[in-house]
Amino acid sequence: MDKMIHQLIEETVSSYLHPFQEDYKDQAFDFSIDSYFNGVEVTGYYKNEYKPDETTPFVLLRLSILHDCKQVHISNIFLPRFMHHRAIGKHMIGNIFGILKQQGYALFIVDMVNSFYCIMIGRGALPCIGCDDAVQIVDTTNLS
């Protein structure tokens, strides 16, 4: 079951991000996914604006899997400026939430900056009691 969660997350993220390689080929967008026992990390790459023959790596998505309590925590989600305003991050969170829900896992976004926290609360994510930098994604969270 544990390996299945890793595989489901990897497949979901990969199939979602794959079309963006074509959409952003001028920016040389690419990504790689690494799994380890308790997490998945997606590294993105795009053309270095100062050295066009090189790419700049960035952490696109980092999540931890807490198998014992059936939770997944997203601690990092980042998109370069040229990928903003297309709801890419929201849809990726929604896709991950969908597969986790089917497996009986809960999804949390943690270590949030205040502005993102407020946005997610406004979108219907549940605040975590006693914590002002984490929310739980639920069915009623607006991720469109």
Q: Across the structure, where does each feature detected by a protein language model lie?
A:
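Non-catalytic substrate-recognition and accessory regions of acyl/acetyltransferase enzymes
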Residues: 1-84, 91-144
